[in-house]
């Protein structure tokens, strides 16, 4: 299958005139392999409808695609326009409030702030889904989607899961995010890497493009980049694994991933339960596939790719020699010598032993069975969503390898649509959806607007979604023996079916429920039962470390030296669980409010928690007064959270040096136009890097503005707040939206994440807090 892009034939164009993508909410269909704990609340899936859409609507979609393509090197993240167009039409939304502008030298009046805020509130309320959540794209890494295509190709399900229109949109996404040098970055804003260039290249070829095909000669340009940068022998370890699975690399060219890891005794420091959950979940199916030395069908395409991806005959590659090779463009975390020594020991001495009789029967077979037991457990406890997209594809493939016709694999196939998102830049794979995360902040932003009477229905639906999305049970059975922590009372990043507790998602969910409990039930619905709030508190208290900080998923505490064994080359801090400033600050704010409303419940434990957590935040401050943000870009994000947490804990500018230093950091980084703008490079470089040309970003501006409001900056000099608010107000678009700018999310120091909802949530919230907290003159 090959797609013509630049000039479609008239016949093809006529066939596609009536075609539209539609976002479906909270639907499970009649698939017998699909099930839910919560009637699919929060589920968001895209369907292609060949009959939908008027000529004007289809033209609007095509114009959005063309506009993205023409500006693809200037603004890399999508504006998430397809879902927005659909919802605004379904709600019959028309912005009836005229826009406002603040002229130079003009004061911001209360009326001006109110008008801008009301426009933002009405617009964003119209984007709410029927089940109460706010859908949004959550993607950005370019290694998410190709392995899914590769897995479906291997298993023979590519054309059923991804029919022609899906494949067209996948190719669109790949083409639209190719860098000018012909390669693809680790994420959409990143420099080209061997990992994502090779994966994207293989994906294009699987989807029917020839060696010289693709938009703008994409395939040939990608191949040239690969050959110019050392060929795929320089793939990082994850890439070598996927190439080995595809039959494009020999397993002997990969470092060992023995499944015997799952048989290790608990007293060892590298026992699975001591690993960070995502690290554990990635290497679980990887070790199964490695232990099996699984290789997919060697098709004519695979034989062609063997010729295209190397600069020497495939049979002549010295696999043993390329094991430690990695392109310099891919290296963020260089392996220490001790790690290479460990791999060499496993490769030379241990692995040959485990693959020979009698150990292949006595040990390897048992290890593979234990590994699959864990895979099935994790699959069942996430309703086959799994913990994330990287793990999803690997677990799905492992289930197929175990039994190609089995129910386990069919249940996995049924959940593939949960990961797919479509926007004007094409079809991509999400991390796993940010439904609860985005909705928690959206609700707080809307509540801060003090416009509840105008948006009561919106708030009631949001409240209902949050209540329904709380996890009601712990993982099944003896979950501790399966290396799992309690989850009852938590909120996940996405929806209840996902099942994985996250501390900051829990804190923000708890905060929403507590804020709603202060409001009339006839407006926002019945408040949550106290016992369920207590369960949430238990989760938060259980995740605090001795240093006062809060871990994200599971209790931290494994020895730090285990990070020396980080097997990836492009992530940092992935081996063990760590504490995070943002999680800690979120929990402080939630527990302070909980303590005020439920003063008798675990009072001493909560007070001890808050004291330790505040101290942790102070201890983590950087010399320049900032805090490093682990989940957003970067020091601006971390500082907003830290100042909010410290303020909630009773600290202020006068009694807390950390707040004074944090305030100075924000004031020192304000741009000339009144905003803030921080480059994503701050995250990997661990130092503040402004955007090029000192540009501002509205999301960063809102974070900084709210941080300064937390520190009560208005009591000292109100001008920086007015300047920031002016930029937010003047940047609002005609319909009440805000423009999409640079990427603002991150994970594991080096990989950026696009949160499409942030451009609405945070400018709205910033203006709301400004209007609420700052005395403004009346007109």
From Swiss-Prot:
Catalyses which reaction(s): (S)-2,3-epoxysqualene = taraxerol
UniProt keyword terms in alphabetical order: Isomerase, Repeat
Tissue: Expressed only in the epidermal cells on both sides of the leaf and not in internal leaf tissues.
Active-site residue list: 504 (proton donor)
Pfam family, one: SQHop_cyclase_C
Class in the EC hierarchy, top level: isomerase
One Gene Ontology CC term in the entry: lipid droplet
Top-rank lineage group of the source organism: Eukaryota
GO molecular function: beta-amyrin synthase activity; intramolecular transferase activity
Presence of keyword Isomerase: yes
Keyword Repeat part of the UniProt annotation: yes
PFTB repeat intervals: 167-208, 659-700
Name of the protein this chain belongs to: Taraxerol synthase
Organism this protein belongs to: Kalanchoe daigremontiana
Taxonomic lineage from the root: Eukaryota, Viridiplantae, Streptophyta, Embryophyta, Tracheophyta
């Amino acid at each position: 299958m090959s797609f013509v892009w630049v000039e479609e034939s008239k016949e093809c164009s006529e066939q596609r005139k009536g075609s539209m993508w539609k976002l479906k909410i909270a639907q499970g269909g009649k698939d017998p392999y699909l099930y839910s704990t919560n009637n699919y609340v929060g589920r968001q899936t895209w369907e292609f409808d060949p009959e939908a859409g008027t000529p004007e609507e289809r033209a609007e979609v095509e114009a959005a695609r063309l506009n993205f393509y023409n500006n693809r090197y200037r603004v890399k993240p999508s504006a998430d326009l397809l879902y927005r167009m659909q919802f605004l039409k379904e709600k019959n939304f028309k912005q009836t409030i005229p826009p406002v502008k603040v002229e130079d030298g003009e004061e911001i009046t209360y009326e001006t702030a109110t008008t801008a805020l009301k426009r933002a509130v009405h617009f964003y309320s119209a984007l709410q889904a029927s089940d109460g959540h706010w859908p949004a794209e959550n993607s950005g890494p370019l290694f998410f989607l190709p392995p899914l295509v590769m897995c479906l190709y291997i298993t023979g399900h590519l054309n059923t899961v991804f029919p022609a229109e899906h494949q067209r949109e996948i190719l669109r996404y790949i083409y639209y995010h190719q860098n000018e040098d012909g390669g693809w970055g680790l994420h959409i804003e990143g420099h080209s890497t061997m990992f994502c260039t090779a994966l994207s290249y293989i994906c294009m070829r699987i989807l029917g493009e020839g060696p010289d095909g693709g938009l703008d000669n994409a395939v040939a340009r990608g191949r040239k980049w690969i050959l110019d940068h050392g060929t795929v022998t320089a793939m990082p370890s994850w890439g070598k694994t996927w190439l080995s699975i595809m039959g494009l690399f020999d397993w002997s060219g990969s470092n060992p991933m023995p499944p015997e890891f799952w048989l290790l005794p608990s007293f060892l420091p590298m026992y699975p339960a001591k690993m960070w959950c995502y690290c554990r979940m990635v290497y679980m199916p990887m070790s199964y596939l490695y232990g099996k030395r699984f290789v997919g069908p060697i098709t004519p395409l695979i034989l062609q790719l063997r010729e295209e991806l190397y600069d020497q005959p495939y049979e002549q590659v010295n696999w043993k020699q390329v094991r430690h090779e990695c392109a310099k463009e891919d290296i963020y975390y260089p392996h220490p010598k001790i790690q290479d020594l460990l791999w060499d020991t496993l490769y030379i001495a241990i692995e040959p032993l485990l693959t020979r009789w009698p150990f292949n029967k006595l040990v390897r077979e048992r290890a593979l069975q234990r590994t699959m037991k864990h895979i099935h457990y994790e699959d069942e406890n996430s309703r086959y969503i799994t913990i994330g997209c990287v793990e999803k594809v690997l677990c799905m493939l492992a289930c197929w390898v175990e039994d190609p016709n089995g129910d386990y694999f069919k249940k996995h196939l049924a959940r593939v649509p949960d990961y797919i998102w479509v926007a004007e830049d094409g079809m991509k794979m999400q991390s796993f959806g940010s439904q609860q995360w985005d909705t928690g902040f959206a609700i707080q932003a809307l509540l801060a607007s003090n416009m509840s009477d105008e948006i009561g229905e919106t708030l009631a639906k949001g409240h209902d979604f949050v209540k329904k999305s709380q996890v009601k049970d712990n993982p099944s059975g003896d979950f501790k023996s399966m290396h799992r922590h309690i989850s009852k009372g938590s909120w996940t990043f996405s929806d209840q079916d996902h099942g994985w507790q996250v501390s900051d998602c829990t804190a923000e969910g708890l905060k929403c429920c507590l804020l709603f409990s202060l409001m009339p039930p006839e407006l926002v619905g019945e408040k949550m039962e106290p016992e369920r709030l207590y369960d949430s508190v238990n989760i938060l208290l259980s995740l605090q470390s001795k240093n006062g900080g809060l871990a994200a998923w599971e209790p931290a505490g494994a020895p730090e030296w285990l990070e020396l064994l980080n097997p990836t080359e492009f992530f940092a801090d992935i081996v063990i669980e760590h504490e995070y400033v943002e999680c800690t600050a979120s929990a402080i704010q939630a527990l302070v409010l909980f303590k005020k409303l439920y003063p008798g419940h675990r009072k001493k434990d909560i007070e001890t928690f808050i004291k330790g957590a505040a101290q942790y935040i102070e201890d983590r401050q950087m010399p320049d007064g900032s805090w490093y943000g682990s989940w957003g870009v970067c020091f601006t994000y971390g500082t907003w959270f830290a100042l909010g947490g410290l303020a909630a804990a009773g600290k202020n500018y006068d009694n807390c040096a950390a707040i004074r230093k944090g305030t100075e950091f924000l004031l020192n980084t304000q741009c000339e136009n009144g905003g803030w703008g921080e480059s994503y490079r701050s995250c990997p470089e661990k130092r503040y890097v402004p955007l090029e040309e000192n540009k501002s970003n509205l999301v960063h501006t809102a974070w900084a503005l709210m941080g300064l409001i937390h520190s009560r900056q208005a009591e000292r000099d109100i001008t920086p707040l007015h300047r920031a608010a002016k930029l937010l107000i003047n940047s609002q678009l005609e319909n009440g939206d805000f423009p999409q700018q640079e990427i603002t999310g991150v994970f594991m120091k080096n990989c950026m994440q696009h949160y499409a909802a942030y451009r609405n949530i945070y400018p709205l919230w910033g203006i709301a807090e400004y209007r609420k907290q700052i005395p403004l003159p009346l007109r």
